[in-house]
Amino acid sequence: MRYLVIVLLGLLPVLARAVDFDDTTRHLPLGRVMQVYEDREGSASIAQVSAPLFANRFRTHHEDVLNAGYSTSVFWLKVDLHYLAPARSAPRQWLLELAYPPLDHLELYLPDSDGVYRLVQRTGDALPYDSRQIRQNNYLFTLPLLPGQATTVYLRLH
Protein backbone atom coordinates (compact mmCIF):
# COMPACT_ATOMS: atom_id res chain seq x y z
CA MET A 1 0.00 0.00 0.00
CA ARG A 2 1.37 3.39 -0.95
CA TYR A 3 1.30 6.24 1.52
CA LEU A 4 1.34 10.00 1.29
CA VAL A 5 2.93 11.78 4.15
CA ILE A 6 1.45 15.21 4.54
CA VAL A 7 4.12 16.87 6.60
CA LEU A 8 3.34 19.65 8.97
CA LEU A 9 6.92 20.86 9.22
CA GLY A 10 7.47 21.75 12.82
CA LEU A 11 3.76 22.32 13.06
CA LEU A 12 2.26 23.62 9.90
CA PRO A 13 -0.61 26.05 9.80
CA VAL A 14 -4.01 25.82 8.21
CA LEU A 15 -5.07 26.84 4.72
CA ALA A 16 -7.33 29.38 3.06
CA ARG A 17 -8.07 27.28 0.00
CA ALA A 18 -7.93 23.56 -0.59
CA VAL A 19 -4.57 22.08 -1.43
CA ASP A 20 -4.85 19.75 -4.41
CA PHE A 21 -2.89 16.51 -4.49
CA ASP A 22 -3.11 13.20 -6.32
CA ASP A 23 -1.74 9.67 -6.31
CA THR A 24 1.69 10.86 -7.46
CA THR A 25 2.09 13.14 -4.41
CA ARG A 26 4.51 11.79 -1.82
CA HIS A 27 5.24 14.83 0.36
CA LEU A 28 3.09 17.93 0.78
CA PRO A 29 4.36 20.68 3.13
CA LEU A 30 1.41 22.63 4.51
CA GLY A 31 3.10 25.37 6.56
CA ARG A 32 2.31 28.24 4.23
CA VAL A 33 -1.18 27.12 3.34
CA MET A 34 -2.83 26.20 6.61
CA GLN A 35 -4.89 28.57 8.72
CA VAL A 36 -4.43 29.25 12.44
CA TYR A 37 -6.77 30.49 15.14
CA GLU A 38 -5.34 31.39 18.56
CA ASP A 39 -7.87 30.63 21.28
CA ARG A 40 -6.42 32.60 24.19
CA GLU A 41 -9.02 31.33 26.65
CA GLY A 42 -8.97 27.75 25.36
CA SER A 43 -12.76 27.69 25.37
CA ALA A 44 -13.65 27.21 21.69
CA SER A 45 -15.22 23.88 20.72
CA ILE A 46 -14.94 22.04 17.42
CA ALA A 47 -18.58 22.95 16.72
CA GLN A 48 -17.68 26.63 17.06
CA VAL A 49 -14.43 26.65 15.07
CA SER A 50 -15.89 24.56 12.23
CA ALA A 51 -18.96 26.80 11.85
CA PRO A 52 -18.99 28.90 8.65
CA LEU A 53 -19.38 32.15 10.63
CA PHE A 54 -16.14 31.37 12.50
CA ALA A 55 -14.01 31.07 9.34
CA ASN A 56 -12.96 34.74 9.34
CA ARG A 57 -11.19 34.26 12.70
CA PHE A 58 -8.62 31.95 11.14
CA ARG A 59 -5.52 33.56 9.66
CA THR A 60 -3.46 32.12 6.84
CA HIS A 61 -0.02 31.19 8.04
CA HIS A 62 2.78 32.57 5.83
CA GLU A 63 5.76 30.70 7.27
CA ASP A 64 7.02 27.16 6.85
CA VAL A 65 6.79 26.54 10.59
CA LEU A 66 4.32 27.68 13.25
CA ASN A 67 6.30 29.19 16.12
CA ALA A 68 4.04 30.32 18.94
CA GLY A 69 6.83 30.44 21.50
CA TYR A 70 5.75 29.60 25.03
CA SER A 71 2.02 30.16 25.19
CA THR A 72 -0.89 29.05 27.33
CA SER A 73 -3.23 29.58 24.37
CA VAL A 74 -4.90 26.79 22.45
CA PHE A 75 -4.13 26.86 18.73
CA TRP A 76 -6.55 25.51 16.17
CA LEU A 77 -5.12 24.54 12.79
CA LYS A 78 -7.36 24.19 9.77
CA VAL A 79 -6.21 22.35 6.65
CA ASP A 80 -8.32 22.04 3.50
CA LEU A 81 -7.28 19.07 1.35
CA HIS A 82 -8.58 18.01 -2.06
CA TYR A 83 -7.67 14.51 -3.18
CA LEU A 84 -7.71 14.67 -6.99
CA ALA A 85 -8.56 11.17 -8.08
CA PRO A 86 -11.42 9.70 -10.08
CA ALA A 87 -14.40 8.96 -7.84
CA ARG A 88 -14.10 5.25 -8.70
CA SER A 89 -10.52 5.03 -7.46
CA ALA A 90 -9.73 2.48 -4.79
CA PRO A 91 -9.46 3.88 -1.26
CA ARG A 92 -5.92 4.74 -0.17
CA GLN A 93 -4.37 5.38 3.18
CA TRP A 94 -2.92 8.86 3.58
CA LEU A 95 -0.85 10.05 6.51
CA LEU A 96 -0.78 13.42 8.23
CA GLU A 97 2.49 14.06 10.06
CA LEU A 98 3.29 16.69 12.64
CA ALA A 99 7.05 16.84 12.69
CA TYR A 100 7.20 18.56 16.06
CA PRO A 101 7.24 16.04 18.91
CA PRO A 102 7.04 18.34 22.00
CA LEU A 103 3.28 18.93 22.08
CA ASP A 104 1.44 18.30 25.36
CA HIS A 105 -2.05 17.88 23.91
CA LEU A 106 -3.02 17.28 20.30
CA GLU A 107 -6.48 16.46 18.96
CA LEU A 108 -7.46 15.56 15.39
CA TYR A 109 -11.01 16.25 14.19
CA LEU A 110 -12.52 14.91 10.96
CA PRO A 111 -16.05 15.13 9.56
CA ASP A 112 -18.33 12.11 9.84
CA SER A 113 -20.67 11.00 7.04
CA ASP A 114 -23.11 13.78 8.01
CA GLY A 115 -20.39 16.46 7.92
CA VAL A 116 -20.29 16.83 11.72
CA TYR A 117 -16.76 17.10 13.10
CA ARG A 118 -15.78 14.41 15.59
CA LEU A 119 -12.67 13.82 17.66
CA VAL A 120 -10.89 10.90 15.98
CA GLN A 121 -7.54 10.97 17.78
CA ARG A 122 -6.12 12.45 20.98
CA THR A 123 -2.42 12.25 21.81
CA GLY A 124 0.52 14.33 22.99
CA ASP A 125 3.47 14.32 25.38
CA ALA A 126 1.13 14.57 28.37
CA LEU A 127 -0.46 11.23 27.39
CA PRO A 128 1.13 7.77 27.28
CA TYR A 129 3.16 6.94 24.17
CA ASP A 130 0.57 4.24 23.42
CA SER A 131 -1.98 6.99 22.73
CA ARG A 132 -0.29 7.53 19.36
CA GLN A 133 -2.18 6.00 16.48
CA ILE A 134 1.16 5.14 14.84
CA ARG A 135 4.04 4.67 17.25
CA GLN A 136 6.75 6.93 15.88
CA ASN A 137 8.64 9.97 17.24
CA ASN A 138 6.63 12.46 15.16
CA TYR A 139 2.85 12.42 15.33
CA LEU A 140 1.30 10.44 12.46
CA PHE A 141 -2.42 10.16 11.78
CA THR A 142 -4.24 8.20 9.11
CA LEU A 143 -6.62 10.28 7.00
CA PRO A 144 -9.51 8.54 5.25
CA LEU A 145 -9.75 10.92 2.28
CA LEU A 146 -12.29 10.10 -0.41
CA PRO A 147 -11.25 10.31 -4.07
CA GLY A 148 -12.43 13.48 -5.78
CA GLN A 149 -13.65 15.14 -2.58
CA ALA A 150 -12.37 18.04 -0.52
CA THR A 151 -11.95 17.51 3.22
CA THR A 152 -11.20 20.01 5.97
CA VAL A 153 -9.08 18.73 8.84
CA TYR A 154 -8.90 20.49 12.23
CA LEU A 155 -6.13 20.08 14.79
CA ARG A 156 -6.35 21.44 18.33
CA LEU A 157 -2.96 22.06 19.94
CA HIS A 158 -2.29 22.92 23.57
Range-by-range predicted roles:
Residues 1-4:
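Positively charged n-region of N-terminal signal peptides that target proteins for export
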Residues 11-15:
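N-terminal signal peptide c-region/cleavage motif recognized by signal peptidases
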Residues 18-158:
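Soluble non-transmembrane domains of integral membrane proteins
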